[in-house]
C-alpha cells in the first residue's frame, strides 16, 4: 500500500502537526515557537494543463516546498489546527495566545488571549480543534476546555470563551468529535469525546459535560472515531478507540460511555507496554478495510485491524523519538512527525517512484529549514527570540528509545494485503 518515505528535517522539536483538509499541505508547530507550512507534491495523475496546479508542480516535479515559516509564538507552539474550510490556521502557544493566520500566507488576522489560571499565570494550551466554522475548542494544562464562538467579531486579545468546562481532573490529552446526528441541519459535530488522566468524557456544545467514565486505572492518551463496523445486538457499528499509556487500545461503543467493551494489546513490554501517543484511521479509499494507524512513544507506527482486533503491520518513524503527529493527507499519504523530523509515506508504485527513487530508498529533503525567508509573515514582531521560552515536546508520556537497530524504512503492508477478505469488520 505504501512504499517509500520522504524525510523533512525540522529546526527544533515537533510539538504539533496539522494536515490541510482540502490540499496536500502540512503545517508544524515547533518547540522554538516557529510555525512552518509545507506543500507536498500533487498526484501525477492530475492533468498537465490544470491551471490551478500548485507551486510544487511549477517549481519542479516532486519538490516539497516551504510555503512560509515564521516565529509565531514567544515560547513553544503547543498545538495547531486548520479551520473546517482550510482557509485559516489556528495556533496556540505557551505565550498564552491563540493566533489565527491565513493558511496560504501565514499572515496573522486575529489573536485571542487564553484565560489565565487563578493565580494569574499562563495556562498553557494542550489541544486546539475547529469543531465547525462557528466553534473553536481549546484545552489547557489546568484541565479547562474553552469554547469560542467564531461568529463574534473579536477585537485583538480581548476575546473571552463563550463557555468553559472541566471534563477531567487532569489536562485534556485528546479530543475526538463525534459525527453529526441524522437530524442535524448543519452537518457539523455538536458533541465530542475527550480523554484526560484516567477518564473519558463526552461534552455537548449546548449542554456541557454529559458523562464521564469510570476510572480506567491507566492514563488515557489518544483517541479517534471509527464507524461502519458490523452492527450486532446493541452495537450500532460505531466506536471510539482510545490509546493508553500501557500499550493497550480500548474500544468504546458509541453511547455506552461508562466503561470500555474491548481491549487490544498493541505493544507489550516488560514493566508495561509502550504508550499509544496518537492515531488515525486509514482512509476508506485505500481499500484496506477498518484499520487504524497508531503512533507509539518508542517511534514505531503500528497498524491495527479492527474486527480481527490484531496488529497487522508496523513501520518505524524514528528509533529514539516518539511519534507526536500522525494523519493522512488528501491524497492518502501517511504523514508522521516526531523529534525533529516529519516523514511522508507514499503509496506504493511499480518501479521507480515519482521522485526517481526506487522502492525502499529513503528520500531526503534538506531545504526545509535552510532559510528563514518569509519570517515576516506575522506583522506583530513574533520572530523576535527575546524572552522566548521553550518547554519539552508534548509527548503525553516520557519518550523512550526504541529497541533494536536499523528501523524499517518502507511501508511493508504484506500482512494487511494478505489477510483473508472474509474477516467481518
Swiss-Prot record:
Disulfide-bonded cysteines: none
Region forming the signal peptide: none
Family designation: Belongs to the WD repeat WDR55 family.
- Each WD repeat, start to end: 9-48, 72-111, 117-158, 221-262, 318-355
Q: What name appears for this protein in its UniProt entry?
A: WD repeat-containing protein jip5
Compositionally biased region (Acidic residues): 367-385
Q: Which SUPFAM superfamilies match?
A: WD40 repeat-like (SSF50978)
Q: What is its main location?
A: nucleus
Instruction: Spell out the GO cellular component terms annotated for this protein, sorted alphabetically and separated by semicolons.
Output: nucleolus
For this UniProt record, the keywords arranged alphabetically read as follows: Nucleus, Repeat, WD repeat
InterPro entries the UniProt entry points to: WD40/YVTN_repeat-like_dom_sf, WD40_repeat_dom_sf, WDR55_POC1
Q: Which domain of life is it from?
A: Eukaryota
Q: Does the keyword Repeat apply?
A: yes
Can you say where in the cell this protein is located? Nucleus, Nucleolus
Amino acid at each position: 500500500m505504501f512504499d517509500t518515505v520522504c524525510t523533512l528535517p525540522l529546526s527544533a522539536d515537533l510539538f504539533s502537526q496539522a494536515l490541510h483538509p482540502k490540499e496536500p499541505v502540512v503545517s508544524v508547530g515547533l518547540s522554538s515557537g516557529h510555525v512552518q507550512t509545507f506543500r507536498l507534491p500533487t498526484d501525477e495523475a492530475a492533468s498537465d494543463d490544470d491551471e490551478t496546479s500548485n507551486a510544487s508542480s511549477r517549481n519542479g516535479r516532486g519538490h516539497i516546498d516551504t510555503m512560509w515559516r515564521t516565529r509565531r509564538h514567544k515560547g513553544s507552539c503547543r498545538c495547531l489546527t486548520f479551520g473546517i474550510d482550510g482557509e485559516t490556521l489556528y495556533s496556540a502557544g505557551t505565550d498564552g495566545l491563540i493566533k489565527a493566520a491565513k493558511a496560504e500566507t501565514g499572515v496573522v488576522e486575529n489573536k485571542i488571549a487564553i484565560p489565565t489560571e487563578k493565580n494569574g499565570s499562563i495556562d498553557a494550551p494542550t489541544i486546539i480543534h475547529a469543531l465547525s466554522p462557528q466553534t473553536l475548542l481549546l484545552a489547557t494544562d489546568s484541565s479547562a476546555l474553552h469554547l469560542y464562538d467564531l461568529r463574534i467579531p473579536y477585537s485583538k486579545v480581548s476575546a473571552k470563551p463563550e463557555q468553559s468546562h472541566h471534563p477531567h481532573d487532569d489536562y485534556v490529552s485528546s479530543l475526538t468529535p463525534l459525527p453529526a446526528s441524522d437530524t442535524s441541519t448543519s452537518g457539523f459535530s455538536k458533541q465530542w469525546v475527550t480523554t484526560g488522566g484516567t477518564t473519558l468524557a463526552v461534552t455537548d456544545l449546548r449542554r456541557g459535560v454529559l458523562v464521564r467514565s469510570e476510572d480506567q486505572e491507566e492514563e488515557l492518551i489518544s483517541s479517534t472515531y471509527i464507524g461502519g463496523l458490523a452492527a450486532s445486538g446493541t452495537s450500532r457499528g460505531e466506536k471510539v478507540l482510545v490509546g493508553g499509556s500501557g500499550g493497550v487500545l480500548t474500544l468504546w461503543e458509541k453511547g455506552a460511555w461508562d466503561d470500555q467493551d474491548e481491549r487490544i494489546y498493541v505493544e507489550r513490554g516488560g514493566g508495561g507496554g509502550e504508550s499509544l501517543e496518537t492515531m488515525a484511521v486509514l482512509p476508506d479509499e485505500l481499500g484496506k478495510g477498518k484499520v487504524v494507524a497508531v503512533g507509539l512513544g518508542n517511534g514505531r507506527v503500528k497498524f491495527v485491524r479492527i474486527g480481527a482486533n490484531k496488529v497487522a503491520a508496523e513501520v518505524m518513524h524514528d528509533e529514539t523519538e516518539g511519534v507526536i503527529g500522525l494523519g493522512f493527507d488528501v491524497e492518502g499519504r501517511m504523514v508522521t512527525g516526531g523529534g525533529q523530523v516529519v516523514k511522508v509515506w507514499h503509496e506504493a508504485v511499480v518501479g521507480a517512484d515519482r521522485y526517481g527513487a526506487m522502492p525502499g530508498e529513503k528520500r531526503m529533503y534538506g531545504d526545509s529549514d535552510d532559510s528563514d525567508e518569509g519570517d515576516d509573515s506575522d506583522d506583530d514582531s513574533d520572530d523576535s527570540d527575546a524572552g522566548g521560552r521553550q518547554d519539552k515536546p508534548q509527548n503525553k508520556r516520557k519518550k523512550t528509545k526504541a529497541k533494536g537497530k536499523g528501523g524499517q524504512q518502507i511501508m511493508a503492508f504484506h500482512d494487511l494485503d494478505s489477510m483473508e477478505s472474509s474477516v467481518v469488520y
